[in-house]
């Protein structure tokens, strides 16, 4: 006999977020905790690949990459790659019930480039800067 389960379909983009769209950050962890408390065992999400023209999650340019819109900016700040003032002062839109993808694209990539530049300035972590294929030679 199969075990039954229940859950919800909700895209990551629908999570609450102060930066134009929901992310895989604290709001996602809080939502999973809520699902557990509600006795749910499944959270079905829409595809999370990067989108292109039209911003449809079903029209991704990659089967493997993740959508940079879902990167948690607060976590990047906690990791020392951003300062809160790098993104908190940006205009992420005026309606919390609507995602302005054109504005999001313009603002999010600007902030993510700052985080990437900070990442490049960090010292390498021992063991992570070694090619994975060394053992295969």
List PLM regions with ranges.
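Acidic/aromatic-lined carbohydrate-recognition and catalytic surfaces
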Residues: 2-137
